[in-house]
From Swiss-Prot:
Mapped WD repeat ranges: 156-194, 204-243, 247-285, 286-325, 409-441
Feature: compositional bias, Low complexity: 27-49, 108-119
Alphabetical list of SUPFAM superfamilies matching this protein: WD40 repeat-like (SSF50978)
Biased composition range(s): Polar residues: 62-76
Keyword annotations: Repeat, WD repeat
Pfam families (alphabetical): WD40
Lineage per the UniProt record: Eukaryota, Metazoa, Chordata, Craniata, Vertebrata
Family: Belongs to the WD repeat Groucho/TLE family.
Name of the featured protein: Transducin-like enhancer protein 7
Single GO MF descriptor: transcription corepressor activity
Gene name per UniProt: TLE7
Disordered: region residues: 1-77, 91-119
One GO process term, biological-process aspect: negative regulation of canonical Wnt signaling pathway
Length: 441
């Protein structure tokens, strides 16, 4: 429904699992409540965590239609293993009970019969040798979340670092600011005051990069900012300019690249440029609300914009029609999404984070309760956690439980952040340098 404010049930949670008092979130009418298990389903879908409905829906009277909360225990129990359940004081099967109720799968003449330790026959060995090895890429690996971080080094950029990116394949770091971009190799991450691997000078000395995005293959970088063009860089084998995409606005505030790297969105004051990256041509200059154009993101065939007017807009990338608008009641400073493109996260001026489902009319909010000038968000490629940087503090939060995994306090304000695609390193940009942390598992 174009032009109409979306009415969705908005749930409030204190970050790090701290329960909030029950309250009405939206003052407008029509806000419906959801049973607590449905919220678990919402967050569980971030990682594909299975969720079983408790039974037929319960009809509530109008007096019951209010926003509820979820306790820390209800959230945290979603991913607990056996040892964690025991530590939480929950009942678990005893070893003897497990042995009695579980069938034995040891080889023998009958199920449950003790397995003979005699050597296998040559026929069995030949059959085993004939089984092809399992390709490494099809092995299912556990999506772990880090439990801490360790500071490994500082990269001295020399000027304010407005945007930063780090690759997972080479662990190269790209620090962006006024006049130039500096490229650092992995050896510089662990060495103090090591010179950058390369310096990429911008077209004009007064140009300034304020946003950058690595392509999914990490072989290209696109940058935008106070410049007459959005710049496309080839990173391998030697970093160099591939193309200058001439812009129609003075400053690009935010960039978004589609998952297939075919489309780039560049957000300017009052409009979004939609670029075909393969052919390097401008597809469309799409007008958006002037005060709703600070940041942009893309999920599938939908792109999202937001800014000072507190409204998160969703647009159809094919018809260019406005799909929905969500009044988040506070200025939007950043937008990102989970790797599955199922949830969009909006970072607010109040430091709160709003989660919106990309296909269903569902949303909820994690409360931080602190006004901030900068709010950076980055979802890890594994999908098990994301980081949020507010002023001088960066926190790693587990998904879907929102439990705090680690916290970093910097001496100066954090302007930007990124996580390597292999989930090994975290980089933060500040006044004149970038700080590197290794994630601990």
């Amino acid at each position: 429904m174009s032009g109409e404010k979306e009415e969705a049930s908005l749930r409030m949670f204190g970050a790090y699992g701290e329960p909030e008092e029950r309250r009405d979130v939206l003052e407008s009418s029509g806000v419906s409540s959801q049973p607590e298990p449905q919220v678990q389903q919402q967050l569980g879908s971030l990682l594909g965590v299975p969720w079983q409905p408790p039974g037929p829906p319960i009809q509530h009277s109008p007096a019951d239609q209010e926003t509820s909360t979820v306790t820390q225990q209800q959230w945290h129990l979603q991913g607990l293993g056996r040892s964690e359940l025991q530590a939480a004081g929950l009942p678990d099967a005893q070893p003897g009970e497990a042995a009695e109720s579980s069938p034995s799968f040891l080889l023998g003449s009958e199920v449950g019969q003790p397995y003979s330790s005699s050597s296998p026959s040559e026929e069995v060995l030949s059959l085993l040798r004939a089984i092809p090895p399992i390709p490494d890429e099809v092995v299912v690996r556990q999506k772990r979340a880090p439990q801490g971080s360790w500071k490994v080094g500082t990269l001295f950029h020399g000027k304010r670092v407005y945007a930063v990116a780090i690759s997972g394949s080479t662990h190269h770091v790209y620090t962006c600011g006024s006049g130039y971009i500096r490229v650092w190799d992995e050896s510089a991450l662990h060495a103090g005051e090591k010179a950058p691997r390369a310096q990429l000078d911008l077209q004009h000395p007064q140009d300034r990069v304020v946003t950058c995005k690595l392509f999914p293959d990490e072989r290209s970088l696109i940058t935008g900012g106070a410049s007459q063009a959005v710049t496309l860089w080839d990173l391998a084998p030697t970093p160099q300019v591939r193309a200058q995409l001439t812009s129609t606005g003075p400053t690009c505030y935010s960039l978004a690249v589609s998952s297939d790297a075919h489309i780039c969105l560049a957000c300017f004051h009052g409009f979004v440029e939609i670029w075909d990256l393969q052919n390097q041509i401008l597809i469309r200059k799409h007008e958006v609300p002037v005060y709703g154009s600070r940041c942009v993101d893309i999920t599938g065939n939908i792109f999202w914009t937001g800014g000072e007017d507190t409204i998160l807009y969703s647009w159809d990338l094919r018809s260019y029609q406005r799909l929905h608008q969500h009044n988040l009641q506070n200025e939007i400073l950043s937008i990102t999404h989970d790797p599955g493109e199922e949830w969009v996260l909006a970072g607010l001026r109040t430091s709160d984070i709003v989660f919106l489902h990309t296909r269903r009319n569902e949303q909820f909010k994690a409360l931080m309760k602190k006004y901030t000038r900068h709010h950076s968000l980055k979802f890890a490629s594994c999908g098990s956690y994301f980081v949020t940087a507010i002023d001088t503090r960066l926190s790693g939060l587990e998904a879907p439980s929102l439990q705090k995994l680690f916290q970093i306090e910097e001496s100066s304000g954090i302007l930007c952040c990124d996580v390597s695609s292999d989930n090994q390193y975290l980089v933060m940009g500040s006044s004149s340098s970038a700080t590197i942390y290794q994630l601990l598992y």
